[in-house]
Amino acid sequence: MKQAAYGLVLYIFLMLPPVTALAESIMAIHMHMQMPLFVIAGMLMTPFFQKKFPNLFSKWNSNGIPGIILFMIIVLYWMLPRTMDEALTIPAVEIFKFVSLPFLAGVPLRDSWKKLETRVKNIIYISLSAIFGFMAWLYIASPNQLCNNYLIVEQKTLGWGFVFLAACIFIYFIQTLFIDETEYE
């Protein structure tokens, strides 16, 4: 239960107004730090929810596929430039961000990941790498300002962050093909 407490502390910390204002003031930090930290907070709280609602997880997410689909939908939604803008200007959308990333992305991701077959995990790696590559191209190549609240230079910085993430995920996927994980369990 210590892990759930750490997740709750992280969650509350990320919602503090000064922390939120600082994280959302720079586009790359908003997308590549604040949002993943909300997902991590949800992942840390997952064991608490699994103990409190065991039937929900065993019935709803028995093979991990529904949870990983929900995770992917939420992640794709928050990658759209329009949603980042709306999170800064519409309080209801920001509240949705505070709820959806930890509880609709982080919790299902942790619950699903150990249930997924290796083949499905590989599909997720390839999909995320391709999506991040596309988002990198979108943010770097676009001559127009995609987010009204951020400068074009911040948009390009975010795009290069997506290039880095796409490359890292792809390299990790390639190394999983050559390393037998059962040797390290």
Predicted regions and their residues:
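Alpha-helical membrane segments of multi-pass proteins
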Residues: 1-185
